[in-house]
Every structure is written in C-alpha cells, then in structure tokens.
C-alpha cells in the first residue's frame, strides 16, 4: 500500500515512520510521497535523505480551503496513494480529501482523546493545558480523520506518565518518544495489513 505523509514542520513523526519501514514494521505499507504545507521545512530533507518523493503544496498559494484540499486530493490520487497520514500537519483540510480517502486518513494527536483536543489544541498548547489541569497521565492517540476536528474513530492510544516538575517541553518530548513514535507506525501497519474496520464510529482490530 502506498502511503502519503503530510507534514508542516521538522517531521519527527515522519522519521519514526521511515525508521519503522526500514525495520520492516509497516507491514504492506510503503511511504511513497511526502507533502509539506510550506517550503523549507526539515521534513522535506528527511524525505530527500531517504529517497522519498516530496512536494510542497503551500496553503497561501490557494484562495480557499476547498481549492487547497482539492489540489491535495488530486495530487495524492495521481500518485496512487492508498493511505494518508497527517504527521504534524497543521493546515485544515476539507471535503475533497475526506471524499477521496474515506476512513483512509490517520492523524496522531499528542493527548488521550477526548481530553485536550479539538480547535486550538496543537503543539505545545496541548501539553500546557494538560499541565495546567494537573493530570497525572497524558499520552497520544492515533485516530481516523473526519470533518470534525480530533473526533474521528480512535485506532490506538498509549498513556504516558506526567511528572510533577514537567515543563510543556519535557512532556512533549516524553509523549513523542514513548507514545507517538510507537503507536503511529503500529496503526499504519494495522491499516496496511487490512486489520482495521470501522463500524458505528468505532475501530475494530482483527486478530490482534
């Protein structure tokens, strides 16, 4: 299965997927395309260093979200993409992408959904909110992307301890290393090996 990874920054989750593929841990999946929402991001270098085709589709070059989403969908359809992975992709996508890839878009969110998710909860904001609330555990969630932000069916979750003296940066790093970089490749493997079905807004995993 051909995978497109959509990125907006440094691409640490992209690197986790690349490393997993090299270890044979993406099942029948192959990362075939990296799309960045802006030029010059380090994720593009990661793609180039590993021989993966990359393209830049900058949101500012399009009049509205619908046009941008149509261009995204067309680009991925032309490349024969089977699975779309949002890996730190901070640009909103719209109906053309959902319609082209129904139940075939995965996102990783740095919290245990339904906590600390939805509009405005991205990057360090998520971890700042978790620490302000005083939670004792946080973590990461991989879910299927739907039009409602962070509300799609949950594929995998992993909890991570919150330590008393954590800064947002400390918690972000721990969640990436202990959760995001583990469950994102695993969710991709499950999808590419045909283990995931969606019924009534819930994910069922076969034979695991």
Please give the residue ranges for each predicted region.
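One-carbon transfer enzymes
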Residues: 1-208
